[in-house]
Each structure stands twice: as structure tokens, then as C-alpha cells.
């Protein structure tokens, strides 16, 4: 049984794992929460989804903390009911609200528990579960100290395949360079507002082609901002096919979520990273350091991201020679067998007949 929910950063790597397990003849069902993105993506993948009533603790005030023991107890009972019906041999959690009670339920039911942390700083749920888990995996060094095996993040096969031949200088000659801006499903207001002004400050002959994912209900205002600056850009609220978007791009401007970092490395894409400043424990900034240290990305904190500074950074990066060098370094930083290692870790517990 796979547990993951809330955001694509948890659900999409978990789907990669689920597909890998299914390819080896494993029956997979899913435990999530009622309002997360899993409610769309998991049924679309033809996987049975069970939901339990649970929400996060952070940001819910004193009332939320007072009700937490009762709510958690109810959710654990619901999760035990799912486990009793499905009878999984292994339960694997990749974060999200349902993973906490689901992991406790697995432990109470005597079923091996595997967890995987996608971020450089472990979340609250996984910090607790790491002390109960049969096996603990992490994408980054030091997420759990010494208690975890570091394997990287699962990445979709179609994205990993893009980086097999990192883009060369010759591939970018004879055409404008291509800039992909990705703000996530809700968009990034800072990018939406500052990219048009920053690009307008570049000489027309230095401006790249632009595809900008602006977020739900933010695409019209962003398109207007580009038009006001006389900068040509293709603006959309969502990107349904990220593999195709990465395949098109020479440079990506984006946030620094764990999934994004893993995909950029696997797809061999240079990046200008702007970590989300309100991420829990500032984990996006720590995530970004992996690609920055590798020479595959630049990182700027949002508080310093003026349009003028952004224009300077783009002017620094938008050369085929620079981008080709960064692309090669991105691929070198990729962990390409994370899905396989996580799947084999789960399957080995079944073969060994281990209990939690």
C-alpha cells in the first residue's frame, strides 16, 4: 500500500513507485486524504484510492493542536480498517497528511513500514515515522541524520529519458534560446510580475523564446504584463505535459521543490531557482543547494529578486556555451535509480517476511 498526498511533490514520485511495483506484478492500493491532488491523479492512474479524514497541524492554531489527539486516533482507526481489508505485505509512505496515521496503523498491525523523504529537510510526519519504520530512505544527505539510506527522488521515466543526451552548443545555435518559467500549480506571483520587466530590459536580440506557466487564474494578468512590456511570451495556467516542456527548454526559471530539483537534474536542464520563501523549515532553499553546488543552477532568494537583478542573471546565463556546460553538470547530479531502489527495498521486505 502506497501512502502519499496533498501536493504533486509527494504524489508524483509515489506514482512512479506504484508503476514500478505494478510492473513487477504487485497489487497496489493507495491511502490519501480527501482534498489532495491524489484524488485526481491516482484514479487517473487506475489505482484504488482510499481516503481518511486528516489534515495538517501547522497553521491550525491552538484549537487544531487541542483536537489533534482525537483526530489522529480516528484517522489511525480508519487506516487500520483499510489495512485490514487490503492486507498489504508492505506499507510505504512518501509524505502528506495520510502518511502519519497510515504509518502508525501499519506499525500497530505488524506490517513492515517503509518511508521516503523527498526534501532536504525532513517533514514532521516523516521525522516521527522514521523512528518507527522498518526502512527509511531519503533523497538528500542529512535529511534524517544517519538513519536513512540516501537514494534520490523517484522521477518519471519520460523525464529521465530527456537527459540521456544533454543539450549541446550546436543544438542551441541558429535559433533563439528557450526559457521555460514554472511557478507550480498556483503559480508564483513574484515570477509572474518580474519576468516580463526583466526580459524587457534585455536587448531584443538577446531575448529568448518564453513559455510561462502562471498558475490558475493568473495567466491573463501575466500575459497582459508581457504585452505591456512588448515581450512575446506564451502564457498558460498549467502545463499538462512537463516532459514536453522540459524537452523544449534550454533554461528553466522555477521554484525549488524536491520533485522539481530531481526532474531538472534527470532531464539535464540548467535552472535559475527562486525558492518559495514560506516553505516549512525553508526546505526549498536547502533543496536548491544540490544543483547550485553541482554548477547546474543559480539560486536567488525571493527578497532579493528585483526585476533588474533578474535581468542581470538572465543575461549571465543566456549563452549556449554556459547552458550546455550547466546541462551536463545537471545530469551528473541526477539520481537515476531511485525508483528502482525504493521498489526493490519494498519487495525485499516481502521476500524476507519481515514484520514492523
Model regions and ranges:
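Conserved nucleotide-sugar phosphate-binding/catalytic loop shared by glycosyltransferases and other
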Residues: 2-5, 22-74, 216-218, 301-303
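Acidic donor-binding loop of glycosyltransferase active sites
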Residues: 88-90, 247-262, 269-270
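Glycosyltransferases and closely related glycan-assembly transferases
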Residues: 78-92, 99-114, 127-131
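Short amphipathic alpha-helix
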Residues: 10-21
Amino acid at each position: 500500500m502506497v501512502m502519499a498526498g496533498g501536493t504533486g511533490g509527494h504524489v508524483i514520485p509515489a506514482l512512479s513507485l506504484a508503476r514500478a511495483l505494478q510492473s513487477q506484478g504487485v497489487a497496489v492500493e493507495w491511502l490519501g486524504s480527501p482534498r489532495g491532488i491524489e484524488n485526481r491523479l491516482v484514479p487517473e492512474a487506475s489505482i484504488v484510492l482510499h481516503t481518511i479524514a486528516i489534515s495538517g497541524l501547522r497553521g491550525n492554531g491552538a484549537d487544531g493542536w487541542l483536537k489533534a489527539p482525537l483526530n489522529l486516533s480516528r484517522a489511525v482507526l480508519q487506516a487500520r480498517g483499510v489495512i485490514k481489508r487490503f492486507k498489504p505485505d508492505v506499507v510505504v509512505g512518501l509524505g502528506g497528511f495520510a502518511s502519519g496515521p497510515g504509518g502508525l496503523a501499519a506499525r500497530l498491525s505488524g506490517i513492515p513500514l517503509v518511508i521516503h523523504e523527498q526534501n532536504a529537510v525532513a517533514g514532521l510526519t516523516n521525522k516521527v515515522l522514521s523512528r518507527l519504520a522498518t526502512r527509511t530512505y531519503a533523497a538528500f544527505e542529512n535529511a534524517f541524520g544517519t538513519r536513512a539510506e540516501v537514494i534520490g527522488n523517484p522521477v518519471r521515466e519520460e523525464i529521465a529519458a530527456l537527459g540521456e543526451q544533454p543539450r549541446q552548443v550546436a543544438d542551441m545555435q541558429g535559433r533563439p534560446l528557450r526559457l521555460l518559467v514554472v511557478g507550480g500549480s498556483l503559480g508564483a506571483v513574484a515570477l509572474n510580475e518580474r519576468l516580463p520587466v526583466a526580459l524587457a530590459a534585455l536587448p531584443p536580440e538577446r531575448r529568448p523564446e518564453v513559455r510561462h506557466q502562471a498558475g490558475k487564474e493568473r495567466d491573463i494578468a501575466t500575459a497582459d504584463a508581457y504585452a505591456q512590456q512588448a515581450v512575446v511570451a506564451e502564457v498558460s495556467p498549467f502545463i499538462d505535459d512537463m516532459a514536453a516542456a522540459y524537452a523544449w527548454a534550454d533554461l528553466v526559471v522555477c521554484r525549488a521543490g524536491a520533485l522539481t530539483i530531481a526532474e531538472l537534474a534527470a532531464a539535464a536542464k540548467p535552472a535559475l531557482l527562486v525558492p518559495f520563501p514560506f516553505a516549512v523549515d525553508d526546505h526549498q532553499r536547502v533543496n536548491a543547494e544540490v544543483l547550485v553546488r553541482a554548477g547546474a543552477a543559480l539560486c536567488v532568494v525571493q527578497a532579493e529578486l528585483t526585476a533588474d537583478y533578474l535581468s542581470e542573471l538572465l543575461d549571465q546565463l543566456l549563452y549556449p556555451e554556459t547552458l550546455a556546460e550547466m546541462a551536463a553538470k545537471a545530469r551528473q547530479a541526477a539520481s537515476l535509480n531511485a525508483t528502482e531502489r525504493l521498489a526493490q527495498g519494498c519487495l525485499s521486505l516481502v521476500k524476507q517476511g519481515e514484520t514492523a
